[in-house]
Every structure is written in C-alpha cells, then in structure tokens.
C-alpha cells in the first residue's frame, strides 16, 4: 500500500493540472506560433515557467485505485496488475479469465 500522503499528492497534482490546463495550452500555442513576435514568445516562456511545476500533465502518475501502487498500472481497470489478477481469480471482472493455450 502506498502512503496516504502519496495518494493525496497525486490528487493535488490532478487538481492543479485541471486548474492550469487552459492557461498552459494558450501559452504553449503562443510559444509555437511562428507569426508571433520574439518578445511575445519570450514573455510566454517566462509566464509558462512561472506556473506551478505540478501543473504540468507529465508530473502526474497513474496509481492503483485500491493500493496506490504506481507501477504495473492497467488503465482499462484502474488497478495494478496484482489487483487485476486477484479480482480475475475471484471472478469479480466479467469476461476476464486466466489464459490457457
């Protein structure tokens, strides 16, 4: 199990990403715009750098909903591979069963 503080940190990051997503997108559009002046582009870079570090989407980490485990995360289920296997063996996931060939 992951520490509660790690889970809380990820939730905080998710809120920051949602809060600043539009602002980051507009600043990145200005930076990549070829027709914008150099001064406007430079000001956009400075404003982007002044935003909170955790507001970047790449800082987020997918975590298992039950355990908070950061590795082996399966997006389709929102669980780690270990919890998916346990649920599968108990028959809690419809249509999913152990492979055999």
Curated annotation (Swiss-Prot):
It comes from Vibrio cholerae serotype O1 (strain ATCC 39315 / El Tor Inaba N16961). This is Small ribosomal subunit protein uS14. SUPFAM superfamilies: Glucocorticoid receptor-like (DNA-binding domain). Belongs to the universal ribosomal protein uS14 family. One of its GO terms (molecular function) is rRNA binding. GO terms for biological process: translation. NCBIfam families: PRK08881.1. Part of the 30S ribosomal subunit. Contacts proteins S3 and S10. Keywords: Ribonucleoprotein, Ribosomal protein, RNA-binding, rRNA-binding. One of its GO terms (cellular component) is cytoplasm. Binds 16S rRNA, required for the assembly of 30S particles and may also be responsible for determining the conformation of the 16S rRNA at the A site. Coiled coil: none annotated. It holds the Pfam family Ribosomal_S14. HAMAP family: Ribosomal_uS14_1 (MF_00537).
């Amino acid at each position: 199990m992951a520490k509660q503080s790690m889970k809380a940190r990820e939730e905080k990051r998710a809120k920051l990403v949602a809060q600043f997503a539009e602002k980051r997108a507009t600043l990145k559009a200005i930076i990549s715009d070829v027709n914008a002046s150099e001064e406007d582009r430079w000001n956009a870079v400075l404003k982007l750098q002044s935003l909170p570090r955790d507001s970047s989407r790449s800082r987020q980490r997918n975590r298992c909903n039950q355990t908070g485990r950061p590795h082996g995360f399966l997006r389709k289920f929102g669980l780690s591979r270990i919890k998916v296997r346990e649920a599968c063996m108990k028959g809690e996931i419809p249509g999913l069963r152990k492979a055999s060939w």
